Regions:
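Metal-dependent phosphoesterases centered on the DNase I-like endonuclease/exonuclease/phosphatase
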Residues: 1-75
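Surface polyanion/phosphate-binding segment centered on an Asp-His-Pro turn
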Residues: 2-4, 66-68, 73, 77-117
């Protein structure tokens, strides 16, 4: 199955993905469900795969001194070989940073002339 799932999952999946704050039972349940989803559908956190020891965060609360990586690209292993890059782009206008994903196409698709011609 070919899956690309991205978004704000509202929890840090690993200790490396969070500084500050506290852990709750509710968060542990959500983390467990996301990890089960990844196992059941053979999904990889591609950013973590590319940056196994890096601490970089996608959400921050400066008043509480908490930073977490809450935003993920989860990609099926079948498609993960097509990932050429993933990244986190710091934002100055939001408490969330953008996450990027670059995939290499398996085949060249020739572009048509478009509707203006």
């Amino acid at each position: 199955m070919q899956i690309v799932l991205g978004g704000d999952f509202n929890c840090a999946l690993a200790p490396l993905d969070k500084i500050g704050g506290t852990s709750t039972e509710r968060k542990k349940t959500v983390i467990s469900k996301i990890k089960n989803l990844c196992t059941n559908f053979d999904l990889q956190d591609v950013w973590r795969s590319q940056h196994p020891r890096t601490s970089q965060y996608t959400w921050r609360n400066n008043s509480l001194k908490v930073q977490c990586r809450l935003d993920y690209w989860l990609v099926s292993k079948e498609l993960s070989v097509l990932v050429t890059n993933s990244g986190i782009v710091t934002s100055t206008i939001s408490d969330h940073s953008a996450i990027t994903l670059h995939l290499q196409s398996r085949e060249y698709v020739q572009r048509g002339p478009g509707f203006r011609n």
